[in-house]
Amino acid sequence: MIPIFIIVHNQYEILKKSVESYKKYINTPIEIIFHNVYSTYFETINYLELQKKKGYKVYDSKINDHHTVIDSIKDYIKHHPICEYIVITDPDIELFNVNSDIIEFYIFLLNKLNVQSVGPMLKIDNIPNFYPNKNQVIKGHTNQFWSKPVKSILFKNTNYQYIECSTDTTFQLFSTKNIPKEFPYKNSIRTLAPYSAQHLDWYINPNDLYPSQLFYLNNTTKISHWNNKKWNGKYYNNNINIINNFFINKYKYIYYYNKCKCKNNYNFGDFITPYIYKILFLKDAILDINGGSKKEDVIIGAGSILSSCNSNSIIWGTGFMFGNEKINKPKKILSVRGPLTRNRLLELGIQCPENYGDIALILPYFYYPEIKKQYKLGIIPHYIDKEKFNKIYINNDENVKIIDVTESIETVIKNILQCEMTISSSLHGIIVSHAYNVKCMWIKITDNIGGGTFKFRDYYGSLKINNYNTLLPYIYDKQISTQEIINLINNYPNPTFPINTKLIIEICPFINIKNKIH
């Protein structure tokens, strides 16, 4: 039995395809083992949990470092001392039309040629034209690998070709007595067809992505031939991927509320839709101040701003503020924030699909920094509540973080991620906490928030949570302990994490996503 260690970090569709290829093409008995490198994407997490239930071994790393796979391998060898060989691979290496004795061939080469590892050459003759960096890949791999001398070796009465070159984690077979301490390594070979492989990242169409691919490409700091490249005179890396330069821009007008009476007129929840737009297209959207007065279509997204729509508005995840507004019929409704908003639209004779979800829930697709927990509790007052909150709450607990919603979106996200759990009188404080798998409790500090409780009830309805209640400000007046608040949060209804947000991203009006609902 040959163990195949697959290093996983947020891949899903590609991972499944690679696993299927190993089961299909390898006739040697294998054991597939997953090494999870701090994955945060919900489909990846759920997939790995399912594999555990099926009996597969899943190692979990608490840090995003693929070198941690070495520790997992050492642990495996410790418990399987008779294991002689092991395969280490990234999740995007697919075996395609290879001879089924590939493992047997690799063991033969490893011993015959006395090298540290054996793996496949990556095909470059079938990379599709829609892959933006096709020419760079071909040139780079030709210079690095294909330009090297090709050698032959006889195996089972047939000559097969290989190249002596450095390797990393592209389906590499090792002896368990010679496991590397780090990658890459030089004393290795790569085999040509019929023992080659495909690098699935090179077959991604930027205008026909799976949701998992969008999440992965925007949240991975280094992917071979995708980012860390120079484009338009700038380097885009660390969560802004050069793939975004190739998205087809379907809409350029957005309506969002930008007149809040707070610091710099900036409430982070109001700017979520233009933030997503800029991540996608690396430029600002055009603000339509009237919600659809232009000749071109206007996207209305995050916020309680549905009452601002017009006949050429496209509604994506927005909601009503009060629940009794009358509106112009929009051009199209893709989704709304929750069922209360939908019910009001139906009362007005406007058809609305049962597609729910605030746009803030998909922020992790575009920005998911690695942040260590530093606080037991985060408190997120609505900007309208800030003055009263400062009077009734004195923060003298080093375990508590006060989060300011008038800071930038990325700052608020980072601050929330620093906390083990939160309480919030800001709706988007609650939603963003949930989006990043942080337990949150809705609190009420004043009666001054526009719309009262409608938008909160609308959002909770989208999660099918009905047994919530507001926690009144007396908890501050009595200055109950942080631990008492934590106990309350632990008993407060929260969604099952991670939240399934595929529907919201699949109907994103800005780009084409596979499995898109029309």
Predicted features, each with a name:
Residues G140-I243:
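C-terminal catalytic/acceptor-binding lobe
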Residues M1-E20:
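N-proximal low-complexity "stem/linker" segments adjacent to membrane-targeting elements
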Residues E20-I30:
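Short, acidic, metal-binding catalytic loop of nucleotide-sugar glycosyltransferases
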Residues N241-H518:
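Active-site anion-handling motifs in enzyme catalytic cores
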Residues E49-H67:
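Conserved donor nucleotide-binding strand/loop of the catalytic core
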Residues H35-Y47:
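A conserved acidic beta->alpha catalytic loop
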Residues H66-I73, I77, E94-N187:
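Conserved catalytic core of nucleotide-sugar-dependent glycosyltransferases
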Residues I82-F96:
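Short beta-strand-to-loop acidic/aromatic patch adjacent to the donor-nucleotide binding site
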